[in-house]
């Protein structure tokens, strides 16, 4: 699909982390995206690739949005210098990611040696942190249990 640069940036800012849902749901990652791991995914201190969700996000964008610019911006949102066509707009998506991740101090995907521990970290909506007054927040959520197919 054809989008203006502005529209592409908006879509990428909104969809850059959609892959977290796909990854946690056990969706299959196509080999063409798995092969991009070394290009777009940073490594943690143990030498393991992190932020694999961006590959799932790009796969989602390719299938549903069908726009190369949006796909490339989503892919580069953790390493914006990897998108050499326009690093400036890639850094906008990086900023959007940092703002939206403010609900958690440190991602389990970043710090843990376990490949599955990030699945236990709840994804919280950033707007849950907004307080309308000086009173203690009455934020409530419920844990979602894995589905039992038996």
Locate predicted features.
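Divalent metal-dependent catalytic cores for phosphoryl transfer on phosphate-bearing substrates
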Residues: 1-150
């Amino acid at each position: 699909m054809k989008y203006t640069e502005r529209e592409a940036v908006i879509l990428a800012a909104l969809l850059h982390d959609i892959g977290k849902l796909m990854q946690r749901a056990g969706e299959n990652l196509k080999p063409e995206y798995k092969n991009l791991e070394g290009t777009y995914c940073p490594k943690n201190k143990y030498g393991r690739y992190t932020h694999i969700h961006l590959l799932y996000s790009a796969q989602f964008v390719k299938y549903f949005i069908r726009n190369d610019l949006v796909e490339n911006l989503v892919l580069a949102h953790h390493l914006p210098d990897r998108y050499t066509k326009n690093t400036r707009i890639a850094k906008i998506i990086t900023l959007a990611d940092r703002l939206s991740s403010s609900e958690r101090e440190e991602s389990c995907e970043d710090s843990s040696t376990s490949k599955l521990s990030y699945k236990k970290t709840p994804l919280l909506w950033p707007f849950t942190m907004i307080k309308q007054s000086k009173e203690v927040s009455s934020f409530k959520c419920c844990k979602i249990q894995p589905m039992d197919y038996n």
